[in-house]
């Protein structure tokens, strides 16, 4: 009987950290471009908010490669990059099928490599102005924290 109790307690203590850690994942990320904020949501409630910088032409939906716009719409996190030119980067699933189709109709490239990332490792970048090529930038400390909240496939809604 004692061995069963010891095994049960050991089992609980071995699995508890994984259970607790898993409970901290975000359900969704919301980017409000006009407010320059990134919100982490869990069970429909905002649990954390961050100030952001956007693309150098932030108004409007990204249409083509090089336009400096940050896309708008529903996407998801499809990759975590821990060895990035921007400290840590979370790749966004832009372009989606609709973005690709719209670009094909106009015979242009929709662009790509849109990410939530930290500050540049090569140049001195700040969040005081919109400086990215269409990405969403936060501080290095913040991207470290954000990367712990999200998993691959976490939805991200980017709105005006």
Positions of predicted regions on the chain:
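Well-ordered beta-strand positions in beta-sheet-rich domains
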Residues: 28, 49-51, 74, 113, ...
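N-terminal post-signal-peptidase region of extra-cytosolic proteins
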Residues: 23-27, 54-78, 98-102, 119, ...
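Hydrophobic alpha-helical transmembrane segments of integral membrane proteins
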Residues: 13-14
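A structural motif detector for short, solvent-exposed N-terminal "entry" segments of globular domains
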Residues: 22-56
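Exported/periplasmic cell-wall-interacting domains
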Residues: 81-160
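Sec-dependent signal peptide recognition
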Residues: 2-10
